[in-house]
Design a protein with these regions (language model features):
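Thiamine diphosphate
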Residues: 96-97, 103-110, 114-131, 144, ...
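Glycine/aspartate-rich loop-and-adjacent alpha/beta segment that forms the canonical ThDP
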Residues: 128, 174-222, 543-575
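Glycine-rich, anion-gripping cofactor-binding loops and their flanking helix/strand elements
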Residues: 71, 89, 224-235, 239-331, ...
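Phosphate/pyrophosphate-binding active-site segments
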Residues: 2-6, 144-151, 155, 294, ...
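Internal gly/pro-rich beta-alpha loop/helix module
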Residues: 114-210
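Active-site nucleophile and cofactor-binding loops and adjacent substrate-binding regions
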Residues: 29-33, 53-64, 79-85, 408-409, ...
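Active-site diphosphate/adenylate-binding microenvironment
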Residues: 12-16, 20, 33-38, 363-451
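A short, small-residue-rich loop immediately preceding and capping a beta-strand
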Residues: 25-29, 50-54, 72-111, 288-294, ...
Length: 575
């Protein structure tokens, strides 16, 4: 039977189900109103024989009772309470659990965020209430009043379960307490025609009366994301590696097709990201599983691929940060720090990847040729696009193994990703928060230690944003060979490639997003005592290879245009 469940009931049942899958065998409940959904979910789980539920009246006592339980059992124990000062009464137990390295899960109900700060009854700011006395804290987003579309349901389910697996992994890794705060919207009680009390017939968690199919967890009671030291990858399946920023060498993946972002590591056959739609269009060439290394951030086609729940994903994280795996969509089935492999990549899969990659690379070259032929001859005021500059930069890096390239966020890194998707370790990018902060300063630091030449490829706004990084005190060491290459399109060209760059918004685009300027980079360089050179696209290759004759820091400017960036992006991606 299928029963219509409120968002609060669904939320609570998903949380209880996933915590049990992550090793919770006992829970301590303090009666309260806002925690009603959790109370009924725990009772149903106990009736199904999945955990033992204890009830205590006082939250302070309940917290220490849970501490005693986990001290002997060695398994995580949850303490559940309502909102308000009830949560504060758990703090003494949190202090003791932290000092005793015990996995107590403080599971607190809360009012939805719109009720904070407006005088709502029994409502306090519960975020951060345990301060440094928990090893981690998770604020699960409140479900809406209505959750209707199945895709929305699957998205909520994946995010909730993945977040719970992550915080439980951190509790285990740090051997300490964690705080999970859950805002619930009314109605708080389950339907009367569903399993609501221990007196009902026990309902297994796979029964759709307990959780509809799209809200259920992994088969065989596995955690949504299994955390382990070593995972095994069967390469006889069509396996695609996605290597983002911070990825590192994994010899086991040698020879496996790889989508590698600038700054990542290519393990096998490097693929142009533009080939993803072609691979997915044919069921016989679509990847059957994904291995994610590092933090992928650049391509929307890859983001959509990672959000697909039908394709198993293994995420590899650094041994120094085993609980910091990248999984934005919450679809990873396994998170590990090392890999072993069985089988070999099918030759048909390798051939399909090579063909799709070759087609994508040829398409990029055709687009570049069209830009040169179509605009340069027809427009006396022609300026190159940033894509053409990126191609010249990529060619220079590919030709000189001693050269280290720093790539700025926004258009430079995206352009380089499609013109030269296999530069890998020759690049460095600051994509942690994808900002344009401190790009020149980062390049200065790289250049001070790198034994060869360094080129920083930046947009004009990134260069202006950190122009102060050009200042090196006279008594300090300056880089010996740094070229700061600025592709100057006089504004925010990245926005022209996004939705707001569509023709429908043209009348407001320049003021709100393009932000045109007339900054003088020659004067700026002179003010900081840095050598300056302006060059054309045709001259750029020679300028980039002239580093042997130069010393110190120089700023090279190539004037570009962004009038056709939206159309160019559409042409590249086939939108």
């Amino acid at each position: 039977m299928t029963v219509d469940l409120s968002p609060a009931t669904l939320h609570a049942r998903v949380v209880v189900d996933e915590l049990i899958r992550n090793g919770m065998q006992e829970a301590v409940l303090c009666p309260g109103s806002r925690s009603t959904p959790l109370a009924f979910a725990l009772a149903a789980a106990e009736a199904a024989g999945r955990l033992t539920l204890h009830v205590r009246v006082d939250e302070r006592s309940a917290g220490f009772f849970a501490l005693g339980l986990t001290a002997v059992s060695g398994t995580p124990v949850a303490v559940v309470c309502t909102s308000g000062s009830a949560v504060a009464n758990l703090h003494p137990a949190a202090v003791e659990a932290r000092f005793n390295h015990r996995q107590v899960v403080f599971l607190t109900a809360n009012r939805p965020p719109e009720m904070e700060g407006v005088g709502a009854q029994q409502t306090i700011v519960q975020r951060g209430i345990f301060a440094h006395d928990v090893v981690d804290e998770l604020i699960l987003p409140a479900a809406g009043r209505e959750v209707e579309a199945q895709a929305d349901m699957q998205g909520w389910n994946a995010h909730w379960r993945a977040a719970l697996c992550r915080i439980m992994a951190r509790a285990a890794a740090s051997a300490g307490p964690v705080h999970i705060d859950i805002p619930f919207r009314e109605p708080l009680t389950p339907p009367v025609d569903g399993p609501v009390s221990p007196g009902d017939v026990a309902v297994p968690p796979t029964d759709e009366a307990f959780l509809p199919r799209c809200w259920q967890g992994r088969p065989a009671q596995r955690p949504w994301t299994e955390v382990c030291d070593t995972a095994t990858v069967d390469l006889s399946l069509r396996t695609l590696v996605i290597a983002g920023q911070g990825s590192w060498e994994l010899p086991a993946l040698a020879g496996v097709p790889t989508l590698c972002e600038p700054g990542g590591r290519t393990f096998g056959v490097p693929l142009n990201p533009l080939c993803v739609p072609a691979l997915l269009a044919d069921p016989t060439t679509a990847p059957q599983q994904l291995v994610v290394v590092g933090k992928p951030t650049l391509h929307r086609s890859v983001t959509r691929l990672l959000a697909d729940p039908t394709r198993p994903q293994i995420v590899v994280t650094a041994p120094t940060a085993p609980t910091e795996w990248a999984d934005v969509a919450g679809q990873a089935q396994t998170a590990c720090t090392n890999l072993t492999v069985t089988g070999e990549s099918p030759q048909r899969w390798l051939a399909a990847c090579a063909e799709a990659d070759g087609t994508a690379r040829a398409h990029v070259l055709d687009v570049l040729a069209g830009l040169r032929a179509g605009q340069r001859d027809a427009d006396p005021g022609w300026l190159p696009s940033g894509l053409e500059v990126a191609y010249a930069v990529g060619e220079a890096v590919a030709a000189d193994p001693t050269l280290l390239l720093f790539v700025g966020s926004s258009n430079p890194v995206r352009d380089l990703a499609v013109t030269h998707p296999d530069l890998g370790p020759h690049c460095w990018v600051n994509r942690g928060a994808s900002g344009i902060d401190g790009n020149i300063s980062t390049a200065m630091g790289l250049a001070l230690h790198h034994p060869g030449p360094v080129v920083a490829f930046l947009g004009d706004l990134a260069a202006l944003h950190d122009s102060g990084g050009l200042l090196v005190p006279t008594l300090e060491n300056a880089p010996k060979n740094l070229t700061i290459l600025v592709a100057n399109d006089a504004g925010g060209g990245i926005f022209a490639t996004l939705e707001q760059g569509a023709p429908a918004y043209e009348d407001q685009f320049e003021r709100l997003f393009g932000v045109p300027h007339t900054a003088d980079f020659e004067a700026l360089a002179a003010g900081w005592g840095v050598a300056y050179q302006q060059c054309t696209l045709a001259e750029l290759a020679g300028v980039l290879t002239s580093h042997a004759a130069q010393a110190g820091v120089r700023l090279v400017e190539v004037c570009t245009q962004r009038r056709h960036r939206h159309a160019l992006a559409a042409t590249l991606t086939g939108r």
